[in-house]
Amino acid sequence: MPTSGFVRSTGVFMMAPSAAAKTPITIRLCGPRGFCAGVDRAIQIVVLALKEFGAPVYVRHEIVHNRYVVEGLEAKGAIFVEELDEIPPEHRKQPVVFSAHGVPKSVPADADERNLFYLDATCPLVSKVHKQAMRHHRMGRHVVLIGHAGHPEVIGTMGQLPEGAVSLVETVEDADVYMPPDADNLGFVTQTTLSVDDTAGVIKRLHERFPNLTAPAADSICYATTNRQEAVKQAAPGCDLFLVVGAPNSSNSKRLVEVALRAGAKKAVLVQRASEIDWSTVGDISMVGLSAGASAPEVIVNEIIEAFRDRYDATVELADTVEENEHFLVNRELRHVELTGADMAFVNGE
């Protein structure tokens, strides 16, 4: 690793610090990290809708689980609501965007009833899970959904099928006691943002109890979740402190904290901004790991690096695993709209 000059990693430029009377530390920066293709697409849909239709554009639920992103979109004219009945009658000709996490079938049906124009920003990989669940159901199987109760993605997936057609299993302990309506006719799908290792344990236990359990045609856990967890696994050993940039309601970010601890980090913490770091508890450190959940923008990663540089003689070590090139198209209604350089910087989390 050079001791001076610029080092570039996924859009981040880092000036290696000159010698100073500060404690030297290394920041091990994971790659890939931050925005995935589904998050990028969802944010882009809201920005494009604002350019095409003007403010306000309503968004049902946080478009992605990150306050920095949500507040940035609010500043541009987006209004976030939890339910469609919060949209005032005088604004019902304005578009409403469904979040990247997906929605139950009842939500677009409700929008149609209210004569609302909606744009679905559901991540295509979440939509794939919906299709997998519906295929199990068409084949006459009861669907087991491995996921976290109350998460918007789980609510959306369960809402694709009639009530009672899906059972939620969260843990190996749940799998131990689960009693299906027909043990010989089961199919499973998973939430896309789970711990890869934890999910494998749940699936293994379900297969032990129900040998005829049918897997989906393709893995439900998304590429970005898998890649970020693998990068953290490789970077965490030897870290005195591991920071994950992400929101407390971000499933994939919380899983990264768990992965870091299991992989050998002495301490792992979830933070939304550099201002949340409790420096009084950091203690003696020489190696810091840093990653970001799939809905966390790169600008906050840079903010945290600079916060460490203010206090330490920090050198950044890149811990890249795989390169991500995935890209998802936005809705047809928006493909003709052009974004400025500033728009793209926001969409890319810069």
Curated annotation (Swiss-Prot):
Example of a GO biological process term: terpenoid biosynthetic process
Pfam families found in the cross-reference section: LYTB (PF02401)
Pathway: Isoprenoid biosynthesis; dimethylallyl diphosphate biosynthesis; dimethylallyl diphosphate from (2E)-4-hydroxy-3-methylbutenyl diphosphate: step 1/1; Isoprenoid biosynthesis; isopentenyl diphosphate biosynthesis via DXP pathway; isopentenyl diphosphate from 1-deoxy-D-xylulose 5-phosphate: step 6/6
Active site per the UniProt annotation: E153
Domain of life: Bacteria
Positions with a binding annotation for dimethylallyl diphosphate: H65, H101, H151, S250, S251, N252, S295
Gene3D superfamilies on file: 3.40.50.11270, 4-hydroxy-3-methylbut-2-enyl diphosphate reductase, catalytic domain
Cofactor binding, per record: Binds 1 [4Fe-4S] cluster per subunit.
CDD domains per the UniProt record, alphabetical: lytB_ispH (cd13944)
Residues that, per the record, bind [4Fe-4S] cluster: C36, C123, C222
Record-listed (2E)-4-hydroxy-3-methylbut-2-enyl diphosphate binding positions: H65, H101, H151, T192, S250, S251, N252, S295
Binding residues for isopentenyl diphosphate: H65, H101, H151, S250, S251, N252, S295
Entry keyword set: 4Fe-4S, Iron, Iron-sulfur, Isoprene biosynthesis, Metal-binding, Oxidoreductase
Record EC number: 1.17.7.4
Its biological purpose: Catalyzes the conversion of 1-hydroxy-2-methyl-2-(E)-butenyl 4-diphosphate (HMBPP) into a mixture of isopentenyl diphosphate (IPP) and dimethylallyl diphosphate (DMAPP). Acts in the terminal step of the DOXP/MEP pathway for isoprenoid precursor biosynthesis.
UniProt family annotation: Belongs to the IspH family.
NCBIfam families, A to Z: ispH_lytB, PRK01045.1-4
Record-given protein name: 4-hydroxy-3-methylbut-2-enyl diphosphate reductase
Protein source organism: Rhizobium meliloti (strain 1021) (Ensifer meliloti)
